[in-house]
Amino acid sequence: VAPFPHGKLVTYKYIADVKAGVDPSLV
């Protein structure tokens, strides 16, 4: 589970960013 409380839409974006090779800490 992603460690932030922004909800499922952001969680899916987080997963997509990780798959794209984007560091989620920069998003």
From Swiss-Prot:
What keywords were assigned to this record?
A: Lipoprotein, Secreted
| The keyword Lipoprotein belongs to this UniProt entry's keyword annotation | yes
Q: Which organism is it from?
A: Apis mellifera
Record note on quaternary structure:
Homodimer.
For this record, an example GO cellular component is:
extracellular region
Chief place of localization: secreted
Taxonomic superkingdom: Eukaryota
According to UniProt, the name of this protein is Larval-specific very high density lipoprotein
Q: Does the keyword Lipoprotein apply?
A: yes
Coiled-coil residue windows: none
Compartment list: Secreted, Extracellular space
What is the tissue localization of expression for this protein? Answer: Hemolymph.
Known role: Unknown (it might play a role in lipid transport and/or storage protein metabolism during metamorphosis).
SS bonds (residue pairs): none
